[in-house]
């Protein structure tokens, strides 16, 4: 008598209901673990709420799936690209300044719907001429290099623990297999945290005092905390001008991520549901998260790795992971464990992460074969790098302007990004052609 065989491991599964609910739940947990290390590290680095981060990572993912018609198996986690913006406006996570940083990120999120509308109206090819790799590459490189000093400062509290964190991440990433290779950050944090605990570097008093169940939102860190007599319009303007340009780099990253997910799943998400829908979903998720004191959201490459490993491409599995993140956000005890993470652990992991941010910028230049024998390209890239880094590491750390009685501080990244975009637009010889067909072919 013939029997129906179960799907082979190498077979792509687009309807996970055939696996049964228990296995779907386990697959969802796997995606949760994949995004976990990087997602919870961002609030630790910026001073934002870990619980709010998990809540709006889950809600943002569900919103993204709704706006993209539930077709793209993408998880939205915390974006590292905006850490430099938080550091510029609210250094060391100063509580009274975090709402201004969140306002800047929310305004950056507004650029996503604008770009989505432009993509819809004019097509990606025309719009992307203003954001070629010769501009976005150096911006991304600058983000990582500007953050490097904070990573070193954290490592100096205990270099042994920091080096262990780096070593675990490198070993897992290079020689790991299966899920070990996909979650190196999570494993690096776990191992170095355990070593730091053994060395007496961790204070668990906050964990003992934290309740098991509680609300995840810290209202003093939200944009709503700005509505009062203490509102500083100059600082708000500074935050917006400083952080908004970072959105251009993250939007380029988004396009690459959607292409990679499509290639992995053998589906053309560039065409259906379309970049205008995925950008809109990502942008609105970022705006929602920022208003309530959580980091900006972005599509996660770690979850793309899980898709490639499991060959289960059902978006419902990602939505299970999102729901698990939401449930976990209501446990302050868990958030306290993350908040107790010592600086040396954060520093070790940050060394790798910030370096990878800059390396992504370099890869962007190489993959797009930017011609640096062309003086035009050299000038654009040089000014972006020197202005971004030079101003950031100057004594003032920013350019201070007085406009109509309002004091505005422009960070190095803001100045470098704006100068790069303007120079690219006005200098002759802009021959960059955004090849939509290549993205579509990769997804087909």
Regions found by a protein language model. Give the residues of each.
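Intrinsically disordered, low-complexity non-transmembrane regions of multi-pass membrane transporters
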Residues: 1-26, 204-228, 263-270, 425-444
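N-terminal signal-anchor module of multipass membrane proteins
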Residues: 1-76, 81-95
